[in-house]
Amino acid sequence: MKGLIIVGSAKVGSHTNALAKYLVGQFDTHDLDVDIYDLAERPLNQLDFSGTTPSIDEIKTNIKDFQEKVMAADFLVLGTPNYHGSYSGILKNALDHINMDYVKMKPVGLIGNSGGIVSSEPLSHLRVIVRSLLGIAVPTQIATHDSDYSKLDDGTLYLDDDQFQLRAKLFVDQIVSFVNNSPYEHLK
Protein backbone atom coordinates (compact mmCIF):
# COMPACT_ATOMS: atom_id res chain seq x y z
CA MET A 1 0.00 0.00 0.00
CA LYS A 2 1.12 3.52 -0.79
CA GLY A 3 0.35 6.68 1.12
CA LEU A 4 1.08 10.33 0.58
CA ILE A 5 1.29 13.01 3.27
CA ILE A 6 0.85 16.48 1.78
CA VAL A 7 2.38 19.21 3.96
CA GLY A 8 0.74 22.55 3.23
CA SER A 9 3.11 24.93 5.00
CA ALA A 10 5.15 27.63 3.27
CA LYS A 11 7.98 27.16 5.78
CA VAL A 12 10.71 24.57 5.27
CA GLY A 13 11.18 22.56 8.48
CA SER A 14 7.71 23.42 9.78
CA HIS A 15 5.93 21.87 12.75
CA THR A 16 3.48 20.31 10.27
CA ASN A 17 6.43 18.69 8.49
CA ALA A 18 7.76 17.39 11.82
CA LEU A 19 4.37 15.80 12.53
CA ALA A 20 4.34 14.29 9.04
CA LYS A 21 7.78 12.76 9.62
CA TYR A 22 6.62 11.32 12.94
CA LEU A 23 3.62 9.76 11.20
CA VAL A 24 5.84 8.18 8.53
CA GLY A 25 7.56 6.31 11.35
CA GLN A 26 4.19 5.13 12.62
CA PHE A 27 3.14 3.99 9.13
CA ASP A 28 6.45 2.12 8.83
CA THR A 29 5.32 -0.18 11.66
CA HIS A 30 2.60 -1.37 9.25
CA ASP A 31 5.10 -1.85 6.39
CA LEU A 32 3.43 0.86 4.31
CA ASP A 33 5.25 2.94 1.71
CA VAL A 34 4.50 6.55 2.66
CA ASP A 35 5.99 9.64 1.03
CA ILE A 36 5.88 13.24 2.19
CA TYR A 37 5.14 15.90 -0.40
CA ASP A 38 6.17 19.14 1.29
CA LEU A 39 4.78 22.12 -0.60
CA ALA A 40 7.45 24.39 0.94
CA GLU A 41 10.16 22.29 -0.68
CA ARG A 42 8.33 21.62 -3.97
CA PRO A 43 6.07 24.63 -4.54
CA LEU A 44 3.12 24.56 -6.90
CA ASN A 45 2.60 28.32 -6.71
CA GLN A 46 4.50 31.55 -6.23
CA LEU A 47 4.35 32.04 -2.42
CA ASP A 48 7.72 31.06 -1.04
CA PHE A 49 9.06 32.13 2.37
CA SER A 50 12.62 31.30 1.32
CA GLY A 51 12.77 34.46 -0.78
CA THR A 52 13.14 32.69 -4.10
CA THR A 53 10.58 32.34 -6.83
CA PRO A 54 10.53 29.01 -8.67
CA SER A 55 10.52 29.07 -12.45
CA ILE A 56 7.33 28.26 -14.33
CA ASP A 57 8.99 25.08 -15.65
CA GLU A 58 9.81 23.98 -12.10
CA ILE A 59 6.23 24.65 -11.03
CA LYS A 60 4.85 22.66 -14.01
CA THR A 61 7.17 19.75 -13.18
CA ASN A 62 6.13 19.88 -9.52
CA ILE A 63 2.43 19.91 -10.45
CA LYS A 64 2.79 16.87 -12.72
CA ASP A 65 4.75 14.99 -10.04
CA PHE A 66 2.21 15.98 -7.38
CA GLN A 67 -0.72 14.75 -9.49
CA GLU A 68 1.02 11.43 -10.21
CA LYS A 69 1.80 10.85 -6.52
CA VAL A 70 -1.76 11.65 -5.42
CA MET A 71 -3.22 9.35 -8.08
CA ALA A 72 -0.89 6.47 -7.12
CA ALA A 73 -1.60 6.75 -3.38
CA ASP A 74 -4.02 4.37 -1.67
CA PHE A 75 -4.57 6.95 1.06
CA LEU A 76 -3.72 10.58 1.74
CA VAL A 77 -2.92 12.70 4.77
CA LEU A 78 -3.48 16.44 4.44
CA GLY A 79 -1.35 18.55 6.76
CA THR A 80 -1.73 22.26 7.35
CA PRO A 81 -0.65 25.00 9.69
CA ASN A 82 -3.47 27.07 11.16
CA TYR A 83 -3.57 30.14 8.90
CA HIS A 84 -6.07 32.70 10.19
CA GLY A 85 -8.42 30.01 11.51
CA SER A 86 -8.33 27.81 8.42
CA TYR A 87 -6.01 25.73 6.25
CA SER A 88 -3.23 27.30 4.18
CA GLY A 89 -3.66 28.84 0.76
CA ILE A 90 -0.71 26.74 -0.39
CA LEU A 91 -2.64 23.56 0.42
CA LYS A 92 -5.76 24.97 -1.25
CA ASN A 93 -3.73 25.75 -4.36
CA ALA A 94 -2.34 22.20 -4.41
CA LEU A 95 -5.81 20.69 -4.04
CA ASP A 96 -6.99 22.84 -6.94
CA HIS A 97 -4.64 20.83 -9.17
CA ILE A 98 -6.54 17.59 -8.54
CA ASN A 99 -10.17 16.52 -8.88
CA MET A 100 -12.47 13.75 -7.68
CA ASP A 101 -10.71 11.15 -9.83
CA TYR A 102 -7.60 11.52 -7.66
CA VAL A 103 -9.31 11.18 -4.27
CA LYS A 104 -12.51 9.20 -4.87
CA MET A 105 -13.11 6.66 -2.08
CA LYS A 106 -9.59 7.00 -0.66
CA PRO A 107 -9.15 7.34 3.10
CA VAL A 108 -7.84 10.81 3.98
CA GLY A 109 -6.32 11.72 7.33
CA LEU A 110 -6.19 15.32 8.57
CA ILE A 111 -3.38 16.87 10.62
CA GLY A 112 -2.59 20.43 11.63
CA ASN A 113 -0.50 22.63 13.88
CA SER A 114 -1.12 26.01 15.48
CA GLY A 115 1.49 28.43 16.70
CA GLY A 116 -1.09 30.46 18.61
CA ILE A 117 -4.46 29.24 19.80
CA VAL A 118 -4.87 25.48 19.38
CA SER A 119 -7.68 24.96 16.92
CA SER A 120 -9.12 22.11 14.92
CA GLU A 121 -11.03 24.54 12.66
CA PRO A 122 -8.61 24.09 9.73
CA LEU A 123 -9.24 20.34 9.90
CA SER A 124 -13.02 20.86 9.98
CA HIS A 125 -12.72 22.98 6.85
CA LEU A 126 -10.63 20.29 5.17
CA ARG A 127 -13.30 17.67 5.93
CA VAL A 128 -15.65 19.58 3.63
CA ILE A 129 -13.00 19.64 0.89
CA VAL A 130 -12.35 15.89 1.25
CA ARG A 131 -16.08 15.20 1.03
CA SER A 132 -16.31 17.38 -2.10
CA LEU A 133 -13.52 15.32 -3.67
CA LEU A 134 -15.42 12.10 -2.74
CA GLY A 135 -12.69 11.02 -0.32
CA ILE A 136 -13.31 9.44 3.07
CA ALA A 137 -12.04 11.65 5.91
CA VAL A 138 -11.15 9.32 8.78
CA PRO A 139 -12.68 10.25 12.16
CA THR A 140 -9.45 10.64 14.15
CA GLN A 141 -7.46 13.78 13.40
CA ILE A 142 -4.45 15.46 14.98
CA ALA A 143 -4.28 19.16 15.90
CA THR A 144 -1.02 20.06 17.65
CA HIS A 145 0.53 23.24 19.04
CA ASP A 146 4.13 24.43 18.76
CA SER A 147 4.60 23.56 22.45
CA ASP A 148 4.01 19.86 21.65
CA TYR A 149 7.40 19.80 19.89
CA SER A 150 11.03 19.98 20.96
CA LYS A 151 14.17 20.71 18.95
CA LEU A 152 17.22 18.55 18.43
CA ASP A 153 20.66 20.17 18.59
CA ASP A 154 20.57 20.72 14.81
CA GLY A 155 17.23 22.55 15.07
CA THR A 156 15.10 19.70 13.73
CA LEU A 157 11.65 19.62 15.34
CA TYR A 158 10.15 16.42 16.73
CA LEU A 159 6.84 15.55 18.38
CA ASP A 160 7.59 15.39 22.10
CA ASP A 161 4.19 14.89 23.71
CA ASP A 162 3.09 11.45 24.93
CA GLN A 163 -0.62 12.19 24.43
CA PHE A 164 -0.10 13.16 20.81
CA GLN A 165 2.21 10.22 20.19
CA LEU A 166 -0.61 7.95 21.39
CA ARG A 167 -3.12 9.84 19.23
CA ALA A 168 -0.75 9.51 16.24
CA LYS A 169 -0.72 5.74 16.71
CA LEU A 170 -4.54 5.65 16.81
CA PHE A 171 -4.67 7.91 13.74
CA VAL A 172 -2.33 5.67 11.73
CA ASP A 173 -4.05 2.46 12.87
CA GLN A 174 -7.38 3.93 11.78
CA ILE A 175 -6.12 4.87 8.31
CA VAL A 176 -4.56 1.41 7.89
CA SER A 177 -7.86 -0.18 8.91
CA PHE A 178 -9.77 1.93 6.38
CA VAL A 179 -7.29 1.03 3.62
CA ASN A 180 -7.31 -2.70 4.39
CA ASN A 181 -11.07 -3.02 4.91
CA SER A 182 -12.56 -0.62 2.39
CA PRO A 183 -16.08 -1.60 1.34
CA TYR A 184 -15.75 0.99 -1.44
CA GLU A 185 -12.93 -0.58 -3.47
CA HIS A 186 -15.33 -1.41 -6.31
CA LEU A 187 -16.38 2.26 -6.55
CA LYS A 188 -12.90 3.63 -7.30
UniProtKB/Swiss-Prot annotation:
Q: Which UniProt keywords apply?
A: Flavoprotein, FMN, NADP, Oxidoreductase
Q: Which EC class does it fall in?
A: oxidoreductase
Pfam families, per the entry: FMN_red (PF03358)
Q: Name one GO cellular component term.
A: cytosol
Name one molecular function that GO assigns to this entry.
FMN binding
Give the required cofactors.
FMN
Q: What InterPro entries is this protein classified in?
A: Flavoprotein-like_sf (IPR029039), FMN_Rdtase-like_dom (IPR005025), NAD(P)H-dep_reductase (IPR050712)
Checking Gene3D superfamilies in the record gives:
3.40.50.360
Q: Which EC numbers does the record give?
A: 1.7.-.-
Subunit comment: Homotetramer.
The family classification in the record reads: Belongs to the azoreductase type 2 family.
- Biological role: Catalyzes the reductive cleavage of azo bond in aromatic azo compounds to the corresponding amines. Requires NADPH, but not NADH, as an electron donor for its activity.
Which protein, by its recorded name, is this? FMN-dependent NADPH-azoreductase
Name the species this protein comes from: Staphylococcus haemolyticus (strain JCSC1435)
Gene transcribed to yield this protein = azo1
